[in-house]
Amino acid sequence: MQYLEKEEIKEIQLALLDYINETCKKHDIPYFLSYGTMLGAIRHKGMIPWDDDIDISLYREDYERLLKIIEEENHPRYKVLSYDTSSWYFHNFASILDTSTVIEDHVKYKRHDTSLFIDVFPIDRFTDLSIVDKSYKYVALRQLAYIKKSRAVHGDSKLKDFLRLCSWHALRFVNPRYFYKKIDQLVKNAATNTPQYEGGIGIGKEGMKEVFPVDTFKELILTEFEGRMLPVPKKYDQFLTQMYGDYMTPPSKEMQEWYSHSIKAYRKS
């Protein structure tokens, strides 16, 4: 296998993003750059220099349409990784892979090798805010069921580290996919025709930070991203401020190193 340098990884990810963008335009599926990718677009007009992720989000119905279309197109390189397509995958979002590549990321998780990817997040609409706290707890338990023992120790408090280690030992034989089902059921039960809120449920560990008034993400605009014009919510400032605070000020060098990922990527022979 051929080792991929950072710029080569970026080119492969952007080609994958171009494929997703063209697929969404072809099938009239609205999506937007999300999380750190949205931040990168607004602050850097491209990817955050010390980050190597690309994230997009769609409303749940569009999310399911996009995944179905990509699966049915059966592209020779680009494939869907989700709970339904993999026996080991446990996240409540999907990834689109470039299967001509392989990555290793064994720093945090007892995980399988996979491919360079773009994460695809569903946006759900709801009224019952209790699902946010419930899903947050399931996400925390799911993470403990899959991280390496060393990652359960944070060093923030002896008591908290002790409790996390106890939970880690209790959960190490639990399949993390169990928590996917719990979160998925929460989302389905919360579906309503008169929602007040929207956001990513069971996606990460931000809790109420990821909850916004309904239709926050409905209206999209185009912004520059790595020489392309790609969609972000018109209310991007509301999202970025709520998620990151003073988002136009880059973090310190130390924090940039903390945020950076430890992925080694290779092109298959």
Question: What residue ranges belong to the model's regions?
Answer:
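Short, His- and charge-rich active-site/binding loops that engage polyanionic ligands
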Residues: Y138-V139
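Active-site nucleotide-donor binding segment shared across nucleotidyl transfer reactions
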Residues: N21-I54, L58, Y63, D215, ...
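Short, conserved charged micro-motifs
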Residues: E64-K68
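Conserved catalytic core of two-metal-ion nucleotidyltransferases
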Residues: M1-K25, I70-D128, Y146-G155, K160-M243, ...
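A short secondary-structure junction signal
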Residues: L129-S135
